[in-house]
Amino acid sequence: MNTAFILLAQYNGIVIIPLERVCRDYFSHLTPEKLKLKIASGDIDLPLVAIEKSQKAARGVHLNDLATYLDAQHQKAKMEHEKLMGRGSGQSP
């Protein structure tokens, strides 16, 4: 399964997804402003794209960056699950 293709379909071909939509779809526990702060502080490893240099410019997330982030979160969850099941630390079950 290719996450980028799924996102492309989900967002109808939009390459730069508005921050508000990313927040609503994947970070619903945060406000867009809180998401922006977490990204700026490095708590969430997701590059923000500004359409122009103005501080008031719309910000969004490139589809490929969102796909990479989601895939990384998936890998972390799988590794945690493997550890929980006793399979990920080199131990025999």
Please name every model-derived segment:
Residues T3-K34, Y69:
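Polyanion-binding surface elements
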Residues P18, P47, H62-D65:
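Helix N-cap / beta->alpha transition motif
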Residues N2, D25-G60, K83-G90:
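Major-groove DNA-recognition helix of helix-turn-helix-type DNA-binding domains
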Residues M1-N2, Q75:
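Short, structured coil/loop segments at alpha-helix boundaries
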Residues I14-V15, R59-V61:
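Residue-level marker of intrinsically disordered, low-complexity segments enriched
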Residues F5-A9, D45, A77, H81:
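Generic hydrophobic, helix-prone segments enriched in Leu/Val/Ile
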Residues H62-Q91:
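A short, Lys/Arg-enriched interface patch at domain edges and termini
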